[in-house]
Amino acid sequence: MKQTITEKIFSDHVGKEVSAGEIIESKIDMIIGNDITTPISIKQFERSGATKLANPDGFAIVMDHYIPTKDILSANQAKISREFAYKHDLKNYFDEKDMGIEHALLPEKGLVIPGDVIIGADSHTCTHGALGAFSTGMGSTDLAYAMITGKNWFKVPESIKVVFKGKLDKHVYGKDLILEIIRQIGVDGALYKALEFSGEVIEGLSMDDRFSMCNMAIEAGAKSGIIAVDEITKEFLKDKNLRDKPKFFYSDEGAKYDKILEIDVTNLDPVIAYPFLPSNGKSVRQAVRDDLAIDQAFIGSCTNGRLSDLRIAAQILKGKKVARKTRLIITPATQKIARAAEKEGLIDIFIEAGAVVSNPTCGACLGGYMGILGANERCISTTNRNFVGRMGDRTSEIYLANSAVVAASAIAGKIADPRDL
């Protein structure tokens, strides 16, 4: 039987050939929890009477949404995960001593391996498909079941193959590719499907761009996003202390897909997702014509807080100043990224431009802290969601964009095209 990469990964884990639509129980290689969702999993774990994790080394807790904690409630919530991690002597517990947003930190630590089946109690767990793994978000109770048994059940998803061809223009990145897909198919256009990204454009993308694309697969309703391993993937993995041996799977010629989409990116401009859906994409040229003044610009998150994003922003901000009526917040996705940015002089460029640089955290993206929007404020952001009230007051607006557009907009005080600078 001809199989997709997703069908092959599940077949390997189940020990028999499976196909899309089948209900299976699969071994889980890595379970990911965070400070918001893990306490619920812990409660269910303890309620079940379980005393031991099925696979302690395959469980990671990352304190990232409120780190350091912002108030008494978040401090008490963090305490639950912290005490559980100490009680079970978790090797993969990450807090203030080694901070990072989970979906940037785990690949950095070598905890995501090609061929894995990964679940996390966070919808953007699909990020890790960029490394040729099946990775998806699940509920906290599903996480608890996997903590106890080391397994979970799935319906093997059908796949949508997206083939990108052409050549990217300057300041068009992976973020623009995924926003364009979502614009074309809508927020439910890939419901419970595996979005498989391929083509000559993908072959030339950096890992950072690939992570951005897979991260936002969920915004099209997808169960997962996935990119087959190639030389760029292998180069990324080369210096990682991988917890296990990787397995490389590739879709067969003639494998069955729900649909195949072909997208020519040759004339694609940077894409801006207008409020209040990631599918509300428009060209940056349209946004410039709309003359949209901004109160806040944000660069960070598990979508676009990586080193390449900071480098792109620094190139644009160097020698410039953030507009008087605009504030720019920059949040590196991990401590390693923050340190690298500091060594390269990027942090100095940001501060001299008038930006504030925070520690790694999810904070602003979910409207938690470190960048909450007030009434009627408008923000251009490298994050992944622009729903009503996502980053603050229900009357505020979020426009999603790549890091170059956000940096250029911070200087202009309104949404701007970095190619015009």
Predicted features and spans:
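Fe-S-dependent hydro-lyases/dehydratases of central metabolism
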Residues: 1-421
